[in-house]
């Protein structure tokens, strides 16, 4: 399938991210990968005095109902084949290479390759969905977990260690602007490079799971994919720090 590139300069004209695009003193984004799932389990910014983790802990320590299956970069889709629908998840890798910079998942005939690299101070993530089977497969309801640490445990913690994640699900111009609740820098941004984000979903939020004190688990939704045997679809974004 053809790839849709999303030029960086085009995105610089988008409302809230205009300031981000012209920032020239970005601080490096650091991350660690869960060796069991291949998901990103922490994301920090160099020289942040608070050493804030921009992601919810997925080991049950922050919320007992949020576990490793919600790690950053894991996800789900509904497979449609021969008029049958099955909801499937990728959460256990077939292989992890380069300390989590190259992770492969296999779910039925679908291979999901996650590649991570640094470009200057920014983190680039690329997701490739490939049909390794012998039949046409339609993927719908596709979501990638992006568990931003958007919740409200107490005033001091919120000011220093939590984010408001502002999501613009603007197709090929989508972005997330994660602002520290205290309003002071550094902050975190995510901008789409390739593909589209159509919408987002919230999981693990209800009356018995934090109610209004947590945003829940955010997943970004991709458009449906029709993959013939051997076809692939590529989707990517970059993550960077900014001053607000």
Question: Can you annotate each of these PLM segments?
Answer:
Residues 1-8, 57, 97-99, 108-110:
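Bimodal feature
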Residues 1-27:
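Bacterial Sec-dependent N-terminal signal peptides
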Residues 27-104, 150-198, 204:
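Acidic-aromatic substrate-binding/catalytic surfaces of carbohydrate-active enzymes
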Residues 27-37, 104-108, 117-120, 142-151, ...:
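Beta-strand-rich recognition/accessory modules
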Residues 44, 106, 126-128, 140, ...:
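Beta-strand residues in well-ordered beta-sheet regions across diverse protein folds
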Residues 112-114, 137:
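Type-3 copper protein
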Residues 121-125:
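Short, solvent-exposed loop/turn segments enriched in Ser/Thr/Gly
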Residues 129-134:
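Asparagine-centered strand-capping/turn motif at beta-strand->loop junctions
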